[in-house]
Every structure is written in C-alpha cells, then in structure tokens.
Swiss-Prot record:
UniProt region (Disordered), positions on chain: 544-563, 600-634, 726-810
Record key words, sorted: Angiogenesis, Developmental protein, Differentiation, Disulfide bond, Glycoprotein, Immunoglobulin domain, Phosphoprotein, Receptor, Repeat, Signal
SUPFAM superfamilies (UniProt xref): Fibronectin type III, Immunoglobulin
Gene Ontology terms for molecular function: signaling receptor activity
Leader peptide range in chain numbering: 1-37
Protein name from the UniProt record: Roundabout homolog 4
The species this protein was found in: Rattus norvegicus (Rat)
Disulfide cross-links: 63-125, 169-218
Biased composition regions of type Polar residues, renumbered to the chain: 623-634, 770-783
Record-linked InterPro entries: FN3_dom, FN3_sf, Ig-like_dom, Ig-like_dom_sf, Ig-like_fold, Ig_I-set, Ig_sub, Ig_sub2
The keyword Nucleotidyltransferase is assigned to this record: no
Matches recorded under Pfam families: fn3, I-set, Ig_3
The encoding gene: Robo4
Length: 961
C-alpha cells in the first residue's frame, strides 16, 4: 500500500481513535507525516581513503552510511562488483569495513605483478535502500614492493688521475619505483655539476683526483623500504709518465669574448647554460697543442677564495663550455698546454648569466587537515633545477563545485602554508617555485577531502561524542520534537504562574521589622526594659535662674526649633538581643519614656543638712584658669554620687553593681567627668534693682541682707576608668584670687559645711566659703522672683554650641532636696572653675526661664558693690545650659498657671502638656525639675543605688511629696 492509499484510508475511516472517538484530521495527518518522516534515503557519512599495502598486515577501507531503513553496503573494484568468494583476499565486516589482505608472492617479479593486479585498483563503496542509492568517492589501493636483489651491482675500479670514472648500479624492482643515491665512505656523496653527476642510476666522475679514492655504495629506497648494494672500492693512481709541467714563457693567450649560447634552459638531467669562448694566441713560439678553460662562480664579489673548475677545450681558438648554472656570476680564463709544458693563464672575463624559471617543480607536496584549516608543505626542487635563486613559492587551490579557485604567494625560504577551510569539501593544491624570472613548473595536484563532523565521528571512533551531538541536533530539528517541547514549555510556564498567584494570595507581607524611627525604637526600648529610665530620679537636672511668668511666648518660636519631634529616616542601631542582667543600663533622657520612667531605689535618700559642714577636695586644674565659668551648664553639671548613704566607695560601688560604660544610639551617653567632685553655688537677686556683689573674703559670708537664692549641690560620680585612690590622691586647689579677702566674724556668715564622702576612703576636707542670708525666704519667693536684667542678652546660638558638650550630668535627688532646703535662708556657695575657659555669650531664654550670662553677672556684681546690704557673695556663676528642645518649649505652655500661684492647676497644665510629641529628650527632664523645685515639692526615689536591675521590671509610680 502506497503513501497516498494510506492517507485515503485514514480520511475514509474518519480518524477513529483508540477509544472510538474521532480525532481531528490535522492531528491525524501530523502523526502520519511524522511516521513517514522517519524514512530517509541513504547518505555516505565516511568515504574510503587511499591505502597502501605494506608489511604483512591487511589494509582497511572504511565506509559508513546513514538512512532509514538501514542501507546495504557493497564494494566495487574498478567499477565492477567485488567478489567475496576469496576471503583470503577480501573480507567485508558487518559495519561495512573492507579488509584487503596481501597475496603471497612467488619470488619472481612477473608472477608477483600478476598476483597483485587482482587486488590493486580503485575501490568504491555503494549504499542503497528502498529510497535510493549513494556512491562514495573512489579510493586507490597500492602495494609497496621492493625486492632484495640489485640488478646491477657496482664494481671495484682503479682510475688514473685526470681520467673519467663511471660506477654503474641497477636497483631492484619495486613499486613505487625506488630512487637511487650514492654513498662514499658511509656518508652521502655530494654531487657537483661538471665533476660528479648521476646519469640514470650510474655515478660519473669527469676528472678523477686523488681525493676520489674511497668506498662507494648504491642505495635504493621506496615506500616498502630501502636496499643497499655491495661496496665498491675505487682507487685513483698517478700515471707512470706523470712529470711536472714546463712553463711556456713565449706563448701569450688573450681571452677576447665569452658569449651565452642557449638563453633558454635545457630540460633534462643536465640542465644548464653553455657559453662560447674566443681567445687569441700571440708570441714567437708555435701554437699550443691544447687549451683548458678555467671558471668559477662568484656568489659574493668579496669572495675570492673559491676553487677554479678546469674543462679541456676541443678547439684551438674558440670552444664551447657547458656545466654552468643560471643566475650566477662567473669568471672565465684560458690556459695553453703542450704535452708536459703549459703556458701562462689568459686574462679573466666576467659573465653574469640571467635567471630562468625553475625547470623542476617542488617535491614532496603534502596536505594535512588542521583545526579549521589545511596545512600545505613541500620541499624545494633539486639544486641543479633552480635556474637562479629561489625567491618564493606560488600555491594554487584548484576550484571545484563547492570551493572557488584561489592562489597564495609564499616569500622567502618558507616551505609551508596554512589555508583557512571555511567549509568541508575537496581541496586540491599545486605548488611552483619562483625565481627572478617567474614561477616555474607546478607540481602535480595533491587533493585532500575535509569531511563533516558526522562523517569524521563515524569514521573515527574516538570522535563518537561529536557525532552523537550531530545526531541530537538532527533529532531536535524534527517537527514532532519541536511541538512536544513547545507543549512542555507552555505547561511549565502555566505551573509557575499558578504558584506565583497562590503565593501572592496567601503570602504574608513582611513589615519594616526592627527598622524603626529614632523616637519609636527609643519608646519600644523603654517599654521592653524600663528599669534604665528614671522618673524624677537621681538623673534629674535642676535648673535655676530668673523666670518671667508674665510672658506667654513659646520657647520653640524664640529659638526657631520645630516643636514637633522629627521622625528621621535613620535606622536604629539598638540591639534587641536579651541583655545580661549583670550589665546595667544607663539612663536615657533623650526620649519621653526615658525621661518619665524612674529607677527604683532601695531606700529613700537622706537630704543633706545645710548646717553640716561641707568640705570637698577639688582637682588642681579647677584653679588653673581665670574664667569663673564652667564648660557645661550649672544646671546640667556632672552627676553626683547616687546615694550619700552608700557604704562603698564610688568606684567600688560601681564595680559591685557591674556598672559598665555603655553607649546607646540616640541616647544619653555615659559621662566621664574630668573632676571627681564639683560644688556649684550661685545666688540670684529677688529684685531687679539689686545685683550681686563680690564676697569680701573666701571664708565669710556677707552680713547684709540678700535675697533668697537657690544653691545647687552636685557631686560627680566616680569615673569608670579611674579608681578611687587616684581621685583621693589629688590635692585641694588653692582658693581663687577673686574669693580671697578678710574673713568675716559673723557667726551666721560662717556657713562652711563638711560633707562626708560616701566612700571608705574619704577625701581630705577643706573649708570653703559659704554665704548665709540674714533674711530667709521661701522657695516660691526665691524662684518666682523677677528675672535678672542680664537674662535677655544670652543668644540661642551660644547655647546651641554648648549643647554639643557631653561632659554634663544631672542632679541627684539629694542635691535637689538640698537646693530646696537651702533656698529658705542658708546658702552654701562653692567654688568650681571650668577647665576650659569660654567666652561670655548672650543668655538663653527657656520660655519663662532665663539664665544670665557671665557679662550680665559681672555687671550685676559691679552694680551690687555699692549696695552691700542687699546682695550676697557670688562665688561660682552658673554654667550655660544647652539649647532647649521642643519639649521644653512646649513646657512653657503650662507655665501660666504657675504665675498665678495656682499650684494644682499648674501641675495639671504641666502634665497635660507633656505628651510624646515633644518629650523626646532629656531637656524636658531638666525643665520639669525646675518646675517641681519652684513649687517646693520634694522628690524621694525608692532606691538609692545607681545600678539598673530587672530587665522586665515595671516602672515605679510617681510620688509627689
């Protein structure tokens, strides 16, 4: 049934499927055409190559073909089917390889030639199936034969000096025809034109010389091997009548002309030009009996040492001279001779022979495939056929049906060329030598077939991998494979789309995680561990200064600060890992929660009594500067000791609690003070017309009546990097010159206090001058006094620059309480000098709170000098506070109630205005402490130590006393 009948039957049947359903007609046709596409006509993949029978092993001729159904392979010899009846000569393997065995020989050349002719010839491979037949190209089988016996052996010869010598040699029969070479004394004999030449297979010596004596041997060589003849002994003897030549002095020879006879090169075994010599004889003597021509080639004009070649001339006045080479410069001269006598040489003439094209092609031209190229190599033609100097070679690539013709020129003595092979096919090359006259005779064409990858892999089993790749490529080109791949790809994309859809539908979007704003992570930190944030604890900073309760302007509007807490985009650096309970947390006053959450105390602190004498040793560098101003604000000075009732020294207490120097991002850093202790005291007048005056003496207080003042006591905690012994070893600095004077004898003015340091090794005590007001005033009176006249001169820019200092701390509850108690009437002035002098700057206005500048205080002091009954002694002016934050500005909104002496309403207004939007740093804690101090409330924390314990402890409740 043909293909058309099958299609008709399929259409008539309606495309019934396996399940009895009708399939679409195009799908049925696709399957039918796919099945038919499997059948293909035969195609030769591996062509047979030329083989040479040599040795005892068989020769192999390979032939591979593809097709569906699998084609049948048969071999043809010289166009006739090869008979496989004699397996000893021909054997066909299952894969199509033909084995050719060497037939046995009988020793006679004629019989051997007849036997070998039965297997020698051109072999062709033929592959056929029901779709067609494919024929490979022909491959020639040759047999290399070289018999053992020489037909003519050289014989021993004895020659006389000056005579010619001939050694004959007949090489053995062989195929290919063997070449003959002569050896003398075990070395190749060097041939010289005109002296030693090879004619046929015989060696000819024109004029025998003594150095020609030796052992000569003839050697025959072909592909089958080489054969050596017997050694022949050649002896050169002197003639019996040999005598010295006599000089003919009376004869003179004049060489007149040297003429080239044959301008065209002569093809043959003796190529070379010939010249005609003409000379003239003069002299009284009779003419000479014979003449000899002497010539030599002059390759270099500076070369004068080459030997002369002698040739006997036949004529008496002219003669023909041969044995020359084209393209050489020769020197010629003639010598007369008569028997044993000879005359002087004639003059020398020069003749330049022109170059001719080489008379022989290059030898041993071969082709071999490379990596995408074809390598052509050859050997130069024989020296006698150069006909000049070889200047290069011309290479021709013969064109065919698939490749165009091309040619290349190789310059110099290079004897190989690489030709790029752009496509597979047959490459045939010819090579010719080039001289100054042009290209010579080209060589016979040499061909090379470049096969495709599939053919090479099938012929060479080692390249089976590349052939498999070609098969895979051909398979992937089939339509059914392409259709199946497209369907699989579509299904894969559909599955990926479904997975992505389901994941997006059920997926959980991750939030920003721990990357929060600065204020948010601070609040979250205090919620997680609020034991490190005090609520009106020993980290509160007291504030003092004149307050203006009549103004209602906002602090933020004065300082140009946005009252809102800016939420910057910086990511928090807070570590959320659980912290060790042994590592305490430092107070954070930069946020709302850090300012409101108080640390628990083990016992309520004890307020120091104003009557208690205070003596503290100050470092020497406090007195080394003349500036009375400290480097930080007096209200926010260095932190004092946590509890005056601690049994341990400051450094030991910190070590006992494992207090470490920890710095939290965007939190208050741990302050390292440069002084172990600081005592600040300053007094502010209650009336605008009264100012402070200088003290008459360092140890006396003014007996005059002075307004109520706020005295702030501060004691700096132990430094983390210094032990208590180092701090205790520092001497007490001398009293500043501005504080020295006549001591006062007023008992009420002797207000020197001696404080006991909370350490096992107390510091040496030294008396300090203390001011004692003769007229005590209430806390409200002292704090609600009229602001100082110099408080309006402090600028916010100077305060902003002071805010960058990190050497400030806060007041302890004891200091706040002491400040409140001393404000009634007893004032404890202290002396502290900043290690770094700072220029005076305008005052800063905290809404209703203002601080006088150094210049203002100085003016007040000068003005108060004349009114000694109203002012006290100002030992240490206050330090400037940093620039207020929006929280402090917002605090001013609740100050109006306090100005009307309505304490409950002021507290309510103050607390209600303290929201999280502006309570974001420690400045609000300072301002709130001022407000609490002004109302006269005392703060008693429940725990006196400074170590923050309990990571998840709840914050203590607020206590207002």
């Amino acid at each position: 049934m043909g293909q058309g009948e099958e299609l008709r039957a399929a259409v008539d049947s309606g495309g019934m499927g396996l399940l009895g359903t009708k399939c679409p007609l195009p799908l049925l046709l696709l399957f039918i055409m796919g099945g038919k596409a499997l059948d293909s006509p035969p195609q030769i993949l591996v062509h047979p190559q030329d083989q040479l029978l040599q040795g005892s092993g068989p020769a192999k001729m390979s032939c591979r073909a593809s097709g569906q159904p699998l084609p049948t392979i048969r071999w043809l010899l010289n166009g006739q089917p090869l008979s496989m009846a004699t397996p000893d000569l021909h054997y066909l393997q299952s894969d199509g390889t033909l084995l050719l065995h060497r037939p046995p020989t009988h020793g006679r050349p004629q019989d051997d030639q007849n036997i070998l002719s039965a297997i020698l010839g051109v072999y062709t491979c033929e592959a056929s199936n029901r779709l067609g037949t494919a024929v490979s190209r022909g491959a020639r089988l040759s047999v290399a034969v070289l018999q053992e016996d020489f037909r003519i052996q050289p014989r021993d010869t004895v020659a006389v000096v000056g005579e010619s010598l001939v050694l004959e040699c007949g090489p053995p029969w062989g195929y290919p025809k063997p070449s003959v070479s002569w050896w003398k004394d075990g070395k190749p004999l060097v041939l010289q034109p005109g002296k030693r030449t090879v004619s046929g297979d015989s060696l000819m010596v024109a004029r025998a010389e003594k150095n020609d004596t030796g052992t000569y041997m003839c050697m025959a060589t072909n592909n089958a091997g080489q054969r050596e003849s017997r050694a022949a002994r050649v002896s050169i003897q002197e003639s019996p009548d040999h005598k010295e030549h006599l000089e003919l002095l009376a004869v003179r020879i004049q060489l007149e002309n040297v003429t080239l006879l044959n301008p065209e090169p002569v093809k043959g075994p003796k190529p070379g030009p010939a010249v005609w010599l003409s000379w003239k004889v003069s002299g009284p003597a009779a003419p000479a009996q014979s003449y000899t021509a002497l010539f030599r080639a002059q390759r270099d004009p500076r070369d004068q040492g080459s030997p002369w070649t002698e040739v006997l001339l036949d004529g008496l006045l002219n003669a023909k001279l041969g044995g020359l080479r084209w393209g050489q410069d020769y020197e010629f001269k003639v010598r007369p001779s008569s028997g044993r006598a000879r005359g002087p040489d004639s003059n020398v003439l020069l003749l330049r022979l022109p170059e001719q094209v080489p008379s022989a092609p290059p030898q041993e031209v071969t082709l071999r495939p490379g990596n995408g190229s074809v390598f052509v190599s050859w050997a130069p033609p024989p020296a006698e056929n150069h006909n000049g100097f070889i200047r290069g070679y011309q290479v021709w690539s013969l064109g065919n049906a698939s490749l165009p013709a091309a040619n290349w020129t190789v310059v110099g003595e290079q004897t190989q060329l690489e030709i790029a092979a752009r496509m597979p096919g047959s490459y045939c090359v010819q090579v010719a030598a080039v001289t100054g006259a042009g290209a010579g005779e080209p060589s016979i064409p040499v061909c090379l077939l470049l096969e495709q990858a599939m053919e090479q892999s099938a012929r060479d089993p080692s390249k089976h991998v590349s052939w498999t790749l070609e098969q895979l490529r051909a398979t992937l080109k089939r339509p059914e494979v392409i259709a199946s791949g497209a369907v699989l790809l579509w299904l894969l994309l559909l599955g990926i789309a479904v997975c992505i859809y389901r994941r997006r539908k059920a997926g959980v979007h991750l939030g920003p995680g721990l990357y929060r704003y600065t204020s948010e992570d601070a609040i979250l930190k205090h919620r997680m561990d609020h034991s490190d944030s005090p609520w009106l604890a020993d980290t509160w900073r007291s504030t003092s200064g004149s307050r203006d309760l009549s103004s209602s302007s906002s602090l933020s509007s004065r300082l140009g600060v946005d009252p809102r807490d800016p939420l910057d985009g910086r990511r928090s650096l807070i570590s959320w890992d659980p912290r060790s309970p042994g590592v305490p947390l430092l107070p954070d006053t930069s946020t709302f929660y850090g300012s409101l959450i108080a640390e628990q105390t083990s016992s309520p602190p004890v307020r120091p009594s104003p009557q208690t004498p205070a003596a503290r040793r100050l470092p020497p560098k406090l007195t080394g500067t003349s500036s009375p101003w400290a480097s930080s604000d007096s209200l926010c000075s260095r932190r004092g000791l946590c509890s005056p009732r601690m049994s341990l020294a400051p450094a030991e207490a910190w070590k006992a609690k494992k207090k470490q120097e920890l710095h939290q991002a965007n939190s208050s850093p741990l302050l390292q003070g440069s002084h172990p202790m600081e005592i600040w005291a300053w007094e502010l007048g209650s009336r605008a017309s009264k100012n402070l005056s200088q003290s008459p003496g360092p140890n006396t207080c003014s007996p005059r009546e002075a307004p109520g003042a706020v005295v702030a006591w501060r004691a700096l905690g132990p430094q983390l990097h210094r032990n208590s012994s180092e701090l205790a070893a520092r001497p007490l600095p001398p009293t500043p010159l501005s504080l020295r004077g006549a001591p006062s004898h007023d008992p009420q003015s002797q207000c020197v206090e001696k404080l006991q340091a909370p350490s096992s090794d107390p510091l040496p005590a030294a008396p300090l001058s203390v001011l004692n007001s003769s007229r005590p005033s209430s806390p409200q009176a002292s704090f609600l006094s009229v602001p100082s006249p110099g408080s309006s001169n402090l600028s916010s820019s100077s305060l902003s620059s002071l805010e960058e200092e990190d050497q400030d701390s806060v007041l302890t509850p004891e200091e706040v309480a002491l400040c409140l108690e001393l404000s009634d009437g007893e004032e404890t002035p202290t002396n502290s000098v900043s290690p770094m002098p700072r220029a005076p700057s305008p005052p800063a206005t905290y809404g209703y709170i203002s601080i006088p500048t150094s210049s203002g205080l100085a003016d007040m002091g000068r003005a108060g000098g004349g009114v000694g009954s109203e002012v006290g002694n100002l030992l240490c002016p206050p330090r400037l506070c940093p620039t207020p934050t929006p929280s402090e500005g917002s605090l001013a909104n609740g100050w109006g109630s306090a100005s009307e002496d309505n304490v409950p309403s002021a507290r309510a207004s103050l607390v209600s205005s303290s929201d999280g939007s502006f309570l974001a740093d420690a400045h609000f804690a300072r301002a709130l402490a001022v407000a609490v101090d002004s109302f006269g409330f005392s703060l008693e924390p429940r725990e006196a130590d400074c170590v923050f314990t309990g990571m998840w402890a709840r914050p203590p409740p607020l206590e207002w006393t």
